[in-house]
């Protein structure tokens, strides 16, 4: 489970999901009040061995779902899920698709000892001049994965209500304090500049 932290903006501003911290601060309440209903829904649909996401607003003690997805998700959760739980659901689904009836190796994992966060870095219009800090981040212990969606020389033109994503950095740490320090390190060392030198 995760929460979504949005960048601050006025009503009608472009949508920027800055990060997804794991696990959600509402996880215990979700497990106690709602999880059995969601599981019952999927079982009732006859769905087996799949990956699904549900997005919800938490309002006045209730989870109000507004989206369900069956793709592998934009945050690429397979990059951190195995580190956190020991479960590689990609391997399980591949084995199941190839006919292995015993491929469902999922276990109940209500909590993990590590903490995780996915940081998104969005781009404004312009031409990418330089991407700084990738090497420094790649050697930092708590940086699990760096997904790069642009390269120097690319032209960025935001034509929708969502800015183009330039980078996504997945972090896994042993404690909240280590996670906060890693976020600070990433924000200090990582930068994307346009050809005019603007950050």
Region spans (language model):
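Peripheral (often C-terminal) accessory segments that flank ATP-dependent C-N-forming ligase machineries
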Residues: 94-199
């Amino acid at each position: 489970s995760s929460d979504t932290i949005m960048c601050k903006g006025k009503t009608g501003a472009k949508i920027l999901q800055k990060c997804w911290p794991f696990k959600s601060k509402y996880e215990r309440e979700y497990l106690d009040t709602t999880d059995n209903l969601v599981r019952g829904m999927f079982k009732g649909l006859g769905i087996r061995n799949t990956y699904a996401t549900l997005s919800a607003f938490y309002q006045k003690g209730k989870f109000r779902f507004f989206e369900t997805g069956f793709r592998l998700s934009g945050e690429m959760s397979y990059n951190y899920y195995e580190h956190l739980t020991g479960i590689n659901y990609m391997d399980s689904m591949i084995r199941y698709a190839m006919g292995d009836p015993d491929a469902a190796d999922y276990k109940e994992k209500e909590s993990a000892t590590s903490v995780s966060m996915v940081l998104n870095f969005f781009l404004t219009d312009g031409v990418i001049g330089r991407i700084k800090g990738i090497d420094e981040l790649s050697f930092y212990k708590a940086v699990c994965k760096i997904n790069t969606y642009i390269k120097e020389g690319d032209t960025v033109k935001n034509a929708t209500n969502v800015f183009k994503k330039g980078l996504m950095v997945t972090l896994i740490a042993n404690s909240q304090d280590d996670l906060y320090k890693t976020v600070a390190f990433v924000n200090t060392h990582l930068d994307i500049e346009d050809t005019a030198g603007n950050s």
